[in-house]
């Protein structure tokens, strides 16, 4: 990832998030965010697939914890408050996927031991597809919404909007494209509400 991006765009975005009254989550609390995602992702198609067809909370939790810890230096990861009812994780332009060695060093081995070696093939397959699509539509010149999760008990209270709007305003200010992919049909209208356009759809 371009060093200039780290030095300019990421700090700018983090500053916007703090000014909006949101909570930049320190690395030592990323495990708690993984639990929020684990709760929110119940029956999420992609995680069901990662888990071999049936959702496994521990696999989902470990996967999210490893992913967040791997990207923490480059990502903008923030929550609605210190209570961590919901969070968002964005990656700046130039992101082309997590690197293998950092992934393994941040808990990947534990994930493999729990879920079995087949999960590595699934992760690589999905990330290859996701990054190919991202390159097609943005040429990797985008802010990439890697994750938006709100715990089930906190859903329907406007937390997703609270998390999304400051970052979308920042991207408008910087004249930057925002990009994401979702694997759940019911999520499409949510993101369209925030101004995203649907560019790709393939039936599983």
Residue locations for each model-derived region?
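A short beta-loop-alpha structural element at the N-terminal edge
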Residues: 21-35, 43
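Active-site rim helix/loop that mediates acceptor-substrate recognition in acyltransferases
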Residues: 54-76
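Conserved beta-hairpin
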Residues: 73-90
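Conserved acyl-donor/pantetheine-binding loop and adjacent beta-alpha core of acyl/acetyltransferases
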Residues: 87-149, 155
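Conserved GNAT acetyl-CoA-binding A-motif
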Residues: 141-143, 170-183
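Conserved beta-strand-loop-alpha-helix junction that forms the acyl-donor binding cleft
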Residues: 146-155, 179-188, 204
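Conserved acetyl-CoA-binding loop-helix of GNAT-fold acetyltransferases
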Residues: 147-150, 156-169
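Conserved active-site alpha-helix within GNAT-family acetyltransferase domains
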Residues: 161, 173-175, 184-201
């Amino acid at each position: 990832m371009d060093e200039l991006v780290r030095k300019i765009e990421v700090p700018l975005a983090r500053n916007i998030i703090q000014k909006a009254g949101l909570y930049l989550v320190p690395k030592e609390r990323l495990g708690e965010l993984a639990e929020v995602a684990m709760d929110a992702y119940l029956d999420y198609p992609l995680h069901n697939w990662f888990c071999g067809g049936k959702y496994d909370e521990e696999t989902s939790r470990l996967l999210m914890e490893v992913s967040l810890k791997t990207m923490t230096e480059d990502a903008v990861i923030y929550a609605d408050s210190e209570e961590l009812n919901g969070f968002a994780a964005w990656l700046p332009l130039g992101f082309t996927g997590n690197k293998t060695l950092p992934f393994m060093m941040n808990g990947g081995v534990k994930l493999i031991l729990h879920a079995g070696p087949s999960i590595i093939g699934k992760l690589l397959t999905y990330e290859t597809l996701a990054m190919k699509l991202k390159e097609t539509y943005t040429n990797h010149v985008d802010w990439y919404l890697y994750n938006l999760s709100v715990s089930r008990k906190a859903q329907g209270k406007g937390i997703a909007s609270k998390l999304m709007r400051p970052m979308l305003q920042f991207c408008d200010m910087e004249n930057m494209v925002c990009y994401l992919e979702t694997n759940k049909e019911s999520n499409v209208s949510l993101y369209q509400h925030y101004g995203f356009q649907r560019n790709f759809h393939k039936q599983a």
